[in-house]
């Protein structure tokens, strides 16, 4: 589980912009992670710039692009990129060891359709991703901020849902997953109130885990212990 931003929101769900809304979490790198950053960053790393990426230039082709916010150590993201070579993948993570681990795994797997940001997710989304350019946005297991007084810090808020909607193509999907039932209820409430989305669940609640989201070791262990995971998928329709 990785916290993608230290941004806070007010009671109405409005993002409280700060001059510096995050601190890049350096952490302690293993030799392998440090080496992966040094050797793989020139080809897979994306240096933040407040101008929209040209995805065709970045990937050298036209293809649907999937963006993941807060990929943790990156194992699932690398697996997804490996299993869908016809798609482009962009990952955003503030935790440097996670970035190093992701790059190491991607290099070992021979993945060429993955690019990575070591930066604040909100800044990347607002300034570096063009509107209407993404086929899917993924937010898996974000910090649940389970204490009620901290709920306003949850990343899924009204303004965030609108930001994601703008970045998706018509027909693009915002896919969320959480192992906190209360957060899934919060996500559902926010997304049902958001304009321009349609819930892909037949009964208007959650969906079964789709094939494109790998089952993590943590999640498999949770299943054996009877813990739940909730997936929500909302399509941009306007």
Curated annotation (Swiss-Prot):
The keyword Transferase applies. InterPro entries: SAM-dependent_MTases_sf, tRNA_(Gua-N-7)_MeTrfase_Trmb, tRNA_methyltr_TrmB_bact. It catalyses: guanosine(46) in tRNA + S-adenosyl-L-methionine = N(7)-methylguanosine(46) in tRNA + S-adenosyl-L-homocysteine. GO terms for molecular function: tRNA (guanine(46)-N7)-methyltransferase activity. Keywords: Methyltransferase, S-adenosyl-L-methionine, Transferase, tRNA processing. S-adenosyl-L-methionine binds at residues 68, 93, 120, 143. Pfam families: Methyltransf_4. Pathway: tRNA modification; N(7)-methylguanine-tRNA biosynthesis. Coiled coil: none annotated. The keyword Transport does not apply. CDD domains: AdoMet_MTases. The active site is at 143. Its EC number is 2.1.1.33. Substrate binds at residues 147, 179, 216-219. Gene3D superfamilies: Vaccinia Virus protein VP39 (3.40.50.150). Catalyzes the formation of N(7)-methylguanine at position 46 (m7G46) in tRNA. Belongs to the class I-like SAM-binding methyltransferase superfamily. TrmB family. PANTHER family: 3-DEOXY-D-MANNO-OCTULOSONIC-ACID TRANSFERASE/TRNA GUANINE-N 7 - -METHYLTRANSFERASE, PENTACOTRIPEPTIDE-REPEAT REGION OF PRORP DOMAIN-CONTAINING PROTEIN. NCBIfam families: tRNA (guanosine(46)-N7)-methyltransferase TrmB. This is tRNA (guanine-N(7)-)-methyltransferase. It comes from Shewanella sp. (strain ANA-3). The gene is trmB.
């Amino acid at each position: 589980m990785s916290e993608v931003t230290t941004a806070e929101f007010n009671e109405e769900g409005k993002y409280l912009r700060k001059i510096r809304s995050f601190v890049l979490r350096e952490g302690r790198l293993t030799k392998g992670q440090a080496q992966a950053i040094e050797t793989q960053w020139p080809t897979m790393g994306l240096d933040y710039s407040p101008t929209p990426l040209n995805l065709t230039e970045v990937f050298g082709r036209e293809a649907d692009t999937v963006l993941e916010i807060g990929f943790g150590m990156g194992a699932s993201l690398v697996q997804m990129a490996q299993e869908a070579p016809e798609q482009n993948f962009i990952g955003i993570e503030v935790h440097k060891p996670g970035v190093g681990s992701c790059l190491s795994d991607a290099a070992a797997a021979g993945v060429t359709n993955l690019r990575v940001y070591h930066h604040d997710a909100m800044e990347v989304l607002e300034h570096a991703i063009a509107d209407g350019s993404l086929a899917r946005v993924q937010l898996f297991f974000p910090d649940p901020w389970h204490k009620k007084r901290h709920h306003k810090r949850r990343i899924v808020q009204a303004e965030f849902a609108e930001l994601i909607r703008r970045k998706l193509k018509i027909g693009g999907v915002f896919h969320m997953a959480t192992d906190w039932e209360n957060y899934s209820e919060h996500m559902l409430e926010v997304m049902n109130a958001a304009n321009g989305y349609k819930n892909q669940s037949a009964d208007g609640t959650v969906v079964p885990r789709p094939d494109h989201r790998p089952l993590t070791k943590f999640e498999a262990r949770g299943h054996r212990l009877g813990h739940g995971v909730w997936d929500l998928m909302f399509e941009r329709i306007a």
